């Protein structure tokens, strides 16, 4: 246990000098020593070594507020990386990046600690899955189905409904799914974390969820490592042979925290000011979120898209790692269609006739073709009006508008705002409904009948009321 002294402090980045023969290793945790001159600093402040600068000096990131730090303060090396409690004692609890409880419910009842930096599973341990995970959300089950043990990204700009969609997925999957879940709140609003906690508590599934938060108000060091803390807890359950759900809200803030400290660590910024190690940092996290022969991790990640630009380096780097991408569109949200999922932009590796079956595949592709045709005709309609279209095109537009409305659905988590009860639509019902639409069996119904309903039978009932 060597002792060093702070030699420089710039924001969240702190340089600490140790004796040359006792330099801490990269990723080792260091702790601020209690002393009279440390009274203004955060008690027991932890640092993580990022670089060895030579001559006994290491460059670290403070995992907490660096207010009150000054040169000469004593810092002790722990000789090991940051370790957090794992196992069943973490269920039903809210923790911070270091695994300390923040829910005022006493200490975490777990004796087992695990380092947050782990190697990704070896290639021969991996176990890809082709089993589908039913979500009960029509547009997702039809166009971009999820795989058990797969990785899903919810992409969207500010205010198009990423968190609401994620909450609905948690509601539909975590409550129906008897397994365990881990939720990592990375740089998001504290209110959302609070809502999530109460949502879980009210539905009596709190004892199956472990929650880790490093929210918007936390220093960048916390936001940079909190995703790894949550993942370490999920990995422990997976290695026990369980099927785990791992929710991350929001993966973009993980990148952003890295960007905030990157320049202070002396790295040259790359495109759009991101850190030059963007792809490597993302890969380190994503390669660990995987299913092995022992157990599986199904991960659902919200990804903020800066200025609605999907080519921004951060979302573009995240795309590469995912099995399904659910793209939320501002144009669809503007039409009042929620969930605002873009069925033409969203993709899934599972949408393959050998995985989902021929019927599902053909219905999904026909729905996309109809919507694509409508998209192409929209300019003509705007300039010349509907009358100039051929009868086939008029029919395609009419069906596309019905499909567009039928892709909307009332959510359980939004009942308080909409006043209409949430709907869970089984996959078979979803396929049956859209097959009837593209086959022309609903051509006589008004398009309002399809807005905010669950199954196709509800649309028929609504049409009767409208007449």
From Swiss-Prot:
It is a peripheral membrane protein. PROSITE patterns: ATPASE_ALPHA_BETA (PS00152). The keyword Signal does not apply. It is found in: Cell inner membrane. One of its GO terms (cellular component) is proton-transporting ATP synthase complex. SUPFAM superfamilies: C-terminal domain of alpha and beta subunits of F1 ATP synthase, N-terminal domain of alpha and beta subunits of F1 ATP synthase, P-loop containing nucleoside triphosphate hydrolases. It is an enzyme of class 7 (translocase). It catalyses: ATP + H2O + 4 H(+)(in) = ADP + phosphate + 5 H(+)(out). GO terms for molecular function: ATP binding; ATP hydrolysis activity; proton-transporting ATP synthase activity, rotational mechanism. Its EC number is 7.1.2.2. InterPro entries: AAA+_ATPase, ATP-synt_VA_C, ATP_synth_F1_bsu, ATPase_a/bsu_AS, ATPase_alpha/beta_chains, ATPase_F1/V1/A1_a/bsu_N, ATPase_F1/V1/A1_a/bsu_N_sf, ATPase_F1/V1/A1_a/bsu_nucl-bd. ATP binds at residues 156-163. Keywords: ATP synthesis, ATP-binding, Cell inner membrane, Cell membrane, CF(1), Hydrogen ion transport, Ion transport, Membrane, Nucleotide-binding, Translocase, Transport. Its main location: membrane. Produces ATP from ADP in the presence of a proton gradient across the membrane. The catalytic sites are hosted primarily by the beta subunits. F-type ATPases have 2 components, CF(1) - the catalytic core - and CF(0) - the membrane proton channel. CF(1) has five subunits: alpha(3), beta(3), gamma(1), delta(1), epsilon(1). CF(0) has three main subunits: a(1), b(2) and c(9-12). The alpha and beta chains form an alternating ring which encloses part of the gamma chain. CF(1) is attached to CF(0) by a central stalk formed by the gamma and epsilon chains, while a peripheral stalk is formed by the delta and b chains. HAMAP family: ATP_synth_beta_bact (MF_01347). Belongs to the ATPase alpha/beta chains family. This is ATP synthase subunit beta.
